Amino acid sequence: MILEKCGIIFLMEKIVITATAESIEQVEQLLEAGVDRIYVGEKDFGLRLPTTFSYDQLREIAKLVHDAGKELLVAVNALMHQDMMDRIKPFLDFLEEIKTDYITIGDAGVFYVVNRDGYSFKTIYDASTMVTSSRQINFWGQKAGASEAVLAREIPSAELFKMPEILEIPAEVLVYGASVIHHSKRPLLQNYYNFTHIDDEKT
């Protein structure tokens, strides 16, 4: 089994291991290995995932996870444009239907909809490189009702170890797997290649 990404939650009574899955078979393997939370998503609203799943697959994964007594975490952490916000409620309704335990959120608009409509799943603040201080995390916990937060990968260990003294909600740290460039929808790499002509034939 190849593990794509794994995180741990601290400031809790015990360490919680969260892992992404790239197939239903890998979900089963991760559950057998003792992972506490399975992290998955679909193509429109989830970012930084090894693969995406259809609604039917998410339903199947939810059953597997809950039958094993574990928790399902679904990515809703995209930066939402207006057309995406217009489509978000049916997806959140679906997540409620399959009894999703947690969702990750990176956009304030999604927090607003979740709180307005009273969904039962818990929310985790996940804005990637933006999550760099304990007071910022506490703000999202107090004002938006986030139950946890995902810390930026760039935080130095010296700062990281001081955070629990101030944090009011648990935080997740990436312990294994690839990191990312934060979502912007700007074609940065292609612009770089075009500027440097890096793809041109060289003799």
Identify the residue ranges that each predicted region occupies.
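Short, positively charged and aromatic/hydrophobic N-terminal segments
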Residues: 1-4, 8-9
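Active-site pocket-lining/capping segments in soluble small-molecule metabolic enzymes
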Residues: 13-131, 150-203
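Conserved nucleotide-cofactor-binding alpha/beta core module
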Residues: 134-135
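A cross-taxonomic marker for long C-terminal extensions/tails that follow the last structured domain
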Residues: 143-148
